[in-house]
Amino acid sequence: MAGKVKWVTDIEKSVLINNFEKRGWVQVTENEDWNFYWMSVQTIRNVFSVEAGYRLSDDQIVNHFPNHYELTRKDLMVKNIKRYRKELEKEGSPLAEKDENGKYLYLDFVPVTYMLPADYNLFVEEFRKSPSSTWIMKPCGKAQGKGIFLINKLSQIKKWSRDSKTSSFVSQSNKEAYVISLYINNPLLIGGRKFDLRLYVLVSTYRPLRCYMYKLGFCRFCTVKYTPSTSELDNMFVHLTNVAIQKHGEDYNHIHGGKWTVSNLRLYLESTRGKEVTSKLFDEIHWIIVQSLKAVAPVMNNDKHCFECYGYDIIIDDKLKPWLIEVNASPSLTSSTANDRILKYNLINDTLNIAVPNGEIPDCKWNKSPPKEVLGNYEILYDEELAQGDGADRELRSRQGQSLGPRAGRSRDSGRAVLTTWK
């Protein structure tokens, strides 16, 4: 009989530990021989640092890629997507097609974004083109809505820059980088409230790219009705959907936690907008997720000991266009409601079934192609090997989320095009 998997974690969450114990795995310390380490992003940095000089053996796997930040840091994600667009343009790919105003027809899925302080002059130029716009500033390396604020005047950003420079604890050399993005001020509202989507995406390998979408994502709602009014720019209960912020609101509901399941959203949209339009929206969401992964795949350290479950944040505007806002390397495993706890327990269970075949001691040399029976609530979102195989187009087109891309005779209202191939 094979030995038991030895596990370590530095994240004390019951949804993790219960899953390990259910499998009969054995807990050890990080200084002992371990097979599976569910670690924080800080720890992964140390494990793969040159100074650590640590080499993982074939029977060890971890839950982050070494340079996951190429996707999960807001500034690097945007940089990689911009590079990806340029490369496709250079290749003459139809995906990089632009309209008469120079806007990408298909790859325009991230709001206009600049890095600060590096791109300050470029930002000012853009700001002056549409001075009535609202922009959202976010620190590159923080999560849960920390350090975010909205601006609609250049004087506000000048004040921020001045305050940052004169701050006694922030030197100019290591001043925290921010991104500033055009704020989506026409979000789709339900019950007058803004919401976003949190979707879970598992990547088992980047080269070839193989990723899975979790079917049980959810919507996070603001507790206060949305208004684009400048008087409410500082009210984060109106603008930010993060549970870490909304749970402090007077109207926060501790029973449902201000959340809807994705399937409820789908039913709502089918009844209010129609089935075809709703299917097109979800196809497009799936498509932009795959494009974001393709954008970072060339620069990602595709270490065979790694897999990663990302939390994708998507906002839908009132024209039913989805926007990729950010990607989280460590989506929260804290449970805000009973349903939340069940969802996250099942998410970890299904993730482990794919990452650790049969719950046996890992062998990082396996082909990372689990049988369909173990996918649970995951479904294959994209499989590069399959996409490049003979007859793959027909196979892929028959799957949910695999049908976006250029086509003849599109119109702006009929949806932003349907792809005939994923190659």
Swiss-Prot record:
The record marks Q144 as: Essential for specifying alpha-elongation versus initiation step of the polyglutamylase activity. It comes from the Eukaryota. Disulfide bonds: none annotated. GO terms for biological process: cerebellar Purkinje cell differentiation; immune response in nasopharyngeal-associated lymphoid tissue; microtubule cytoskeleton organization; mucociliary clearance; protein polyglutamylation; regulation of blastocyst development; sperm axoneme assembly. Expressed in a wide range of tissues. Has a stronger expression in heart, brain and testis. It catalyses: (L-glutamyl)(n)-gamma-L-glutamyl-L-glutamyl-[protein] + L-glutamate + ATP = (L-glutamyl)(n+1)-gamma-L-glutamyl-L-glutamyl-[protein] + ADP + phosphate + H(+). It holds the Pfam family TTL. One of its GO terms (molecular function) is ATP binding. L-glutamate binds at R220, K259, K344. Residues 391-423 are annotated as: Disordered. It is found in: Cytoplasm, Cytoskeleton; Cytoplasm, Cytoskeleton, Cilium basal body; Cytoplasm, Cytoskeleton, Cilium axoneme; Cell projection, Cilium, Flagellum. Its cofactor is Mg(2+). Gene3D superfamilies: ATP-grasp fold, B domain. ATP binds at K138, Q144, G145, S181, L182, Y183, I184, K194, F195, D196, T241, N242. GO terms for cellular component: ciliary basal body; cytoplasm; extracellular region; microtubule; motile cilium. InterPro entries: TTL/TTLL_fam (IPR004344). SUPFAM superfamilies: Glutathione synthetase ATP-binding domain-like (SSF56059). Gln-144 is the main determinant for regioselectivity, which segregates between initiases and elongases in all tubulin--tyrosine ligase family. A glutamine residue at this position is found in elongases TTLL6, TTLL9, TTLL11, TTLL13, TTLL10 and favors glutamate-chain elongation, whereas an arginine residue is found in initiases TTLL2, TTLL4, TTLL5, TTLL3, TTLL8 and favors initiation. Catalytic subunit of a polyglutamylase complex which modifies tubulin, generating side chains of glutamate on the gamma-carboxyl group of specific glutamate residues within the C-terminal tail of tubulin. Probably involved in the side-chain elongation step of the polyglutamylation reaction rather than the initiation step. Modifies both alpha- and beta-tubulins with a preference for the alpha-tail. Part of the neuronal tubulin polyglutamylase complex which contains TPGS1, TPGS2, TTLL1, LRRC49 and NICN1. Interacts with PCM1, CSTPP1 and LRRC49. Belongs to the tubulin polyglutamylase family. This is Polyglutamylase complex subunit TTLL1. The lineage of its organism: Eukaryota, Metazoa, Chordata, Craniata, Vertebrata.
